[in-house]
Amino acid sequence: MRIQRTPAPPKAPRALLCVHGAGCSPAIFRVQLSKLRAALREDFEFVYATAPFPSAPGPGILPTFEGLGPYYTWFEGSPSGAAAKGDNSNSNDSNSSPTVHDRLAAVHEPVRRAIAEWQTQNPSIPIVGTVSFSEGALVTALLLWQQQMGRIPWLPVMQVAMFICCWYQHEATQYMREEVGCGGDGGIDGEKLVIRGVLSLHLQGRDDFALAGSKMVVAQHFVPGEAQVLEFAGRHHFPNRPRDVLETVKRFRQLCVRARVIG
C-alpha cells in the first residue's frame, strides 16, 4: 500500500528578516514571535539571522528559556546586559569596547549570509521588511541607515519594519554624525541621520527599562510621517495581551498595505 504524504503548505509570497535581541537566538526569537507569525502566516515567511558572538542569556530570557542556549549577541563588548539594570543610553567606555564601526563590521557577515541563503533557496520570495527586538532593533536601524548611505548594497530594500523595544546607545547616533561629518551638534547635515523610505512600527512597553532609549531612536532617526509608535502594557518583550497583539497586527498590516507590500 502506498502511503500518501501530506503536501507541505504553500509558502507566503514575501518574507521578513528577523533580528533577535542580545543573549538570544533565532530559535528563541521564533517562539517570542509565535503570535505574530501565526497572524501573518499567509502573508510572510520569516527569515532569521544569528548574531556572531556567544553570550550569556539576555534580558527577559530567563527563566523561560533556561537551558535552551547557546545564546548570542550582536555587539561584542556590548553593554546591553548592563542596560537591563537601568543604564540603557549612556555607555561610553570607548577605551575598553570596540567602536560602533567595528561592531557593525562584525554584524554584516551573519546578516548577509542569512539573506543570501534565503535568496538562493527561495528566489521567488523576496525579503521586503524586518522584525527586530532590543539590541537587534538597534542593529537593524543602523543597517537601514548604512544602506541609505550606500554602504551595504547587499541588503534588500526594506519597505516595512517592526522595531520591538528598541535598545539604544548614544554611541550609535555619534557614529552616524561622524560618518557624515556632522560633528557633535549635527549642524545642517543632521537630516542625514534620519532613516527615510521605510514605514515603521515601533512597539514600546510602558514598563520597559529601554523605553527612554526607544523613544529617542524614533525621535532622532525616523520621519514622523513614516514611523508609528504603539505603546503596550508590558516590559521588555513582544506584547502578550490579546488586544495588544491584535492592535500590533492591525497597525503592521496597515503599514504593509500603505507600502504596497500586501493588498
From Swiss-Prot:
Single GO term (MF): hydrolase activity
Gene Ontology CC terms, in alphabetical order: cytoplasm; nucleus
Biological pathway: Polyketide biosynthesis; lovastatin biosynthesis
Catalytically driven reaction(s): dihydromonacolin L-[lovastatin nonaketide synthase] + H2O = holo-[lovastatin nonaketide synthase] + dihydromonacolin L carboxylate + H(+)
Induction: Expression is controlled by the monacolin K cluster transcription regulator mokH.
Uses described in the biotechnology field: Monacoline K acts as an inhibitor of HMG-CoA reductase involved in cholesterogenesis. Its hypocholesterolemic activity might be useful for lowering cholesterol levels in the blood and reduce artherosclerosis and coronary heart disease.
Family matches, as InterPro entries: AB_hydrolase_fold, FSH-like_dom, LovG
Top EC group: hydrolase
Active site residues according to the UniProt entry: S134 (charge relay system), D208 (charge relay system), H236 (charge relay system)
Gene Ontology biological process terms from the UniProt entry: secondary metabolite biosynthetic process
Keyword list, A-Z: Hydrolase
EC number per UniProt: 3.1.2.31
Family assignment from sequence similarity: Belongs to the LovG family.
Function: Esterase; part of the gene cluster that mediates the biosynthesis of monakolin K, also known as lovastatin, and which acts as a potent competitive inhibitor of HMG-CoA reductase. Monakolin K biosynthesis is performed in two stages. The first stage is catalyzed by the nonaketide synthase mokA, which belongs to type I polyketide synthases and catalyzes the iterative nine-step formation of the polyketide.
PANTHER family: ESTERASE DBAE-RELATED, ESTERASE OVCA2
Name of this protein: Esterase mokD
